[in-house]
Amino acid sequence: TIINVKCTSPKQCLKPCKDLYGPHAGAKCMNGKCKCYNN
């Protein structure tokens, strides 16, 4: 799921993704936006 959070690295996405999807959520930075996924 792409969320509306700007990023330059996946680390910036980890907290917002975990806040939204819980502690097991993963995060990537794609095209300057965060992408969250559940494992």
From Swiss-Prot:
InterPro entries: Scorpion_toxin-like_sf, Scorpion_toxinS_K_inh. Keywords: Amidation, Disulfide bond, Ion channel impairing toxin, Neurotoxin, Potassium channel impairing toxin, Secreted, Toxin, Voltage-gated potassium channel impairing toxin. The record marks 37 as: Aromatic residue of the functional dyad. One of its GO terms (molecular function) is toxin activity. Its main location: secreted. Expressed by the venom gland. SUPFAM superfamilies: Scorpion toxin-like (SSF57095). Disulfide bonds join 7-29, 13-34, 17-36. One of its GO terms (cellular component) is extracellular region. The modification Asparagine amide is found at residue 39. The keyword Kinase does not apply. Belongs to the short scorpion toxin superfamily. Potassium channel inhibitor family. Alpha-KTx 02 subfamily. Has the structural arrangement of an alpha-helix connected to a beta-sheet by disulfide bonds (CSalpha/beta). Blocks Kv1.3/KCNA3 voltage-gated potassium channels of human T-lymphocytes (Kd=0.25 nM). Negative results: does not inhibit calcium-activated potassium channels (KCa3.1/KCNN4) of human T-lymphocytes. Does not inhibit voltage-gated Shaker potassium channels. Does not inhibit Kv2.1/KCNB1 potassium channels. This is Potassium channel toxin alpha-KTx 2.9. It comes from Centruroides elegans (Bark scorpion). The lineage of its organism: Eukaryota, Metazoa, Ecdysozoa, Arthropoda, Chelicerata.
